[in-house]
């Protein structure tokens, strides 16, 4: 699965359509982290071919309700019909209600405290939870220290809540070592690196190889 980041990344709404459809053609699921929890930010990526959305800074029931209304058709929501890549081959409009995924991003103590209620009420609509470690650390007064005791406690509590509701749980991670660490502690969704980071790594690898000729 590929996550396209419209909140902090180099993608923007005008250039994700072709990229999403390329992913569709090679059967690579693509999730779009939207800029904010508003209808036009959530609905449009699905029209352009995204397989789901990730809602950043989720810490209220109203945000979850807005997300569901913005991406689901009747009887679950109020999404409008349209877009060049809304439907996959063989789908009808109601298939989208079960085939497009909603992930919420927990990035604060407020979000952690409300997560059980969110998953109790809307668990049938939420595919999984992604932790935003940097924003969470900053909001807890930890700076960018995402491995301090306070953060480890917060992350573990989030994992426990997701396991209670049998929901996928993951986090943005710096590398495979961090992914392995959290895999052993219950996570099953690993958002590793960025498109620019991967590009830089591959450029460095190719340069090193050429320099060895």
Regions found by a protein language model. Name each.
Residues 79-88, 100-110, 150-213:
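C-terminal alpha-helical cap/extension of soluble enzyme domains
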Residues 12-35, 39, 43, 47, ...:
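Alpha-helix-loop-beta-strand connector modules within alpha/beta enzyme cores
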Residues 6-10, 58-60, 193-199:
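Short, acidic/turn-prone active-site loops that include or flank metal/cofactor-
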Residues 46, 119-122, 183-184:
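Non-catalytic positions within long, well-ordered alpha-helices that form the structural scaffold/packing
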Residues 2-4, 30-34, 53-55, 102-106, ...:
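Hydrophobic faces of well-ordered beta-strands that scaffold small-molecule active sites
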Residues 1-18, 131-149:
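Glycine-rich, proline-tolerant flexible connector loops at the mouths of alpha/beta enzymes
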Residues 40, 50-128, 133-138:
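Conserved anion-binding
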Residues 19, 61-77, 143, 196-213:
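C-terminal helical cap(s) of enzyme catalytic domains, especially alpha/beta-barrels
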């Amino acid at each position: 699965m590929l996550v396209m980041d419209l909140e902090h990344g180099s993608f923007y709404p005008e250039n994700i359509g072709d990229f999403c459809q390329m992913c569709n053609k090679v059967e690579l699921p693509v999730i779009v982290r939207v800029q904010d929890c508003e209808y036009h930010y959530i609905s449009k990526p699905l029209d352009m071919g995204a397989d789901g959305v990730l809602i950043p800074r989720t810490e209220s029931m109203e945000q979850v309700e807005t997300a569901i209304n913005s991406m689901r058709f009747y009887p679950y929501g109020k999404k409008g019909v349209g877009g060049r890549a809304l439907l996959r081959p063989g789908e009808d409009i109601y298939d989208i209600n079960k085939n497009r995924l909603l992930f919420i991003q927990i990035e604060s103590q407020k979000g952690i405290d409300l997560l059980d209620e969110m998953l109790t009420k809307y668990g049938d609509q939420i595919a999984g939870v992604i932790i935003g470690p940097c924003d969470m650390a900053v909001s807890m007064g930890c700076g960018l220290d995402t491995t301090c005791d306070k953060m480890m406690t917060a992350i573990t509590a989030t994992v426990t809540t997701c396991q209670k509701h049998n929901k996928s749980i993951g986090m943005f991670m710096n590398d495979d070592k961090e992914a392995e660490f959290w895999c052993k502690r219950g996570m099953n969704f690993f958002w590793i690196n960025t498109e620019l980071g991967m590009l830089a790594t591959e450029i460095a690898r190719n340069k090193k190889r050429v320099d060895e000729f």
